[in-house]
Structures are given as C-alpha cells and as structure tokens.
C-alpha cells in the first residue's frame, strides 16, 4: 500500500515512464487508478498480460463488466465526442479510442485533459482536443476492412466504478510486476 499522503504528482512519477510497448497505455492507466486507490502498482509487464491489454475486445469486456459506456462508429471522432458528452467536471475516467487508452477528465472551465503516462520525460495532464485525438490516439474519420466500412468501439469508465469493482484488485495483480521480472519498452526505465 502507498502512504496515505502520496500526491498525484508522486503517483504519476511512480507509474509513468517511457514504455511504448503494445498495450502498455491501457494497463498503465489502470495502474494509475490503482495507485490513486492506495495500491503500490507498477506496470512493466510482458507476456500474456501485455497481449491481453493490447486487445480491444478485452478492453470492451472490462468496460461492460464494470458498467462503463461503449460507443461504436466508423468515425473515431464521433464515437469519442459522444463519450466526452457524458463526462462530469472534476471526475477522472479511463478512456480508450482508436489505438490508445488514457485517463481523461474535464476541468471546471470545460476543457478536456488526458493523462500522458508513457513519455520518458514529460508525463502529466495535457490538453485534449481533436488534434490530440488524431495524433496521440490515432483516431480516423473512417475504418475499412476489405473495402467495407467498419465500426470500432471506444470506451469510457468512471474511475470510481473501477475502484469499487470486486475484480479490480485481481486485475491490478495481473498488471503489477515484480521488479526482477519487469520488461521495459524502448526508453523504459526501472521504477
């Protein structure tokens, strides 16, 4: 367990790092929520855990199991916009869309922010807008498979739903990695 006086900045420094391995965005955001709940969780895993969190359908199952919201559309921007409309000011949410997952929130002034946790040097809350959705999340206006338009899901979970879910601690155990078994992505560092 983390000391009760652990600050958000300390949590971001603890879980953030230059890990860009497949699926690490999805699990590091969950590790952040775990740390906010007081658990000492680091996310530098490999093997089956890495594969699990890189699959959209697994993220969809997590959203469904805890009572989050899914939106499907051929246009990622439209799906994201519908999800963003449901965000309450001051609350934090687990959000995935297109090729990325992150924590997201809306400030008192109505601005959306996302939590960068994969940078080797510059983690923290950043402005979230259409440009970020395109460049950081990889959002597209249309998805096709073999020439046919295809809908993809985007998901949103109130972090309090996750924190209160009976299976969340088990998920954190799956993410948490013993120091001698940690696998780092390019530019990752030991935490």
Regions found by a protein language model. Name each.
Residues 1-47:
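Active-site-adjacent structural segments surrounding the nucleophilic cysteine of cysteine proteases
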Residues 8, 26, 55-59, 77-80, ...:
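Short amphipathic alpha-helical segments that mediate assembly, nucleic-acid/protein binding
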Residues 11-12, 33, 62, 87, ...:
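Weak global preference for isoleucine
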Residues 17, 64, 89, 138, ...:
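Generic surface-pattern signal
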Residues 35-101, 105-128, 132-135:
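Conserved active-site-adjacent core of cysteine acyl-enzyme catalytic domains
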Residues 114-115, 120-191:
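Noncatalytic regulatory segments and standalone regulatory/sensor domains
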């Amino acid at each position: 367990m983390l000391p009760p006086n652990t600050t958000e900045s300390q949590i971001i420094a603890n879980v953030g790092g230059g890990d860009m391995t497949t699926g690490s965005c999805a699990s590091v955001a969950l590790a952040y929520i775990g740390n906010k709940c007081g658990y000492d969780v680091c996310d530098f895993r490999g093997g089956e855990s890495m594969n699990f969190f890189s699959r959209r359908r697994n993220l969809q199952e997590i959203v469904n199991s805890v009572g989050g919201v899914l939106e499907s559309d051929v246009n990622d921007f439209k799906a994201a916009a519908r999800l963003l409309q449901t965000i309450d000011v001051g609350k934090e949410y687990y959000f995935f869309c297109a090729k990325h997952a992150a924590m997201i929130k809306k400030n008192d002034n109505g601005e959306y922010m996302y939590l960068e946790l994969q940078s080797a040097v510059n983690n923290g809350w950043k402005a979230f807008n259409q440009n970020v959705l395109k460049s950081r999340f990889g959002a597209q206006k249309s998805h096709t498979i073999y020439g046919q338009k295809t809908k993809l899901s985007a998901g949103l979970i109130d972090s309090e739903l996750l924190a209160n879910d009976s299976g969340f601690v088990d998920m954190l155990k799956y993410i948490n990695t013993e120091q001698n078994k940690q696998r780092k992505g390019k530019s990752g560092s030991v935490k």
